């Protein structure tokens, strides 16, 4: 059962201009430590930053019904999985908000699609509730 859907698109040029101006101060503000480590290994830093920014915005939109006011950039992380596919990890108020949307006896499942087509990065996030097995 779907409990939240969010989408965002971000201009890599805009994020790149901010990164060029503020550097690590900008990336440290929006990325977790793990995401910052991945950023350092990337050739196209603007696309990476824009994609992660879009994911975080999409997460906040998917959680709109949770009415959380304490969400922070670091509470939604997107890391590369073993096969290179993005893996979404929620913590803090993002995770707490998602759990408030779950019906009794259900667990949280996170789905993410991240696309880069210069100069844009787009992210689509779906939060779903799955029946827990006993």
Per-region residue spans from a language model:
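Core catalytic alpha/beta fold that binds nucleotide/phospho-ligands
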Residues: 1-134
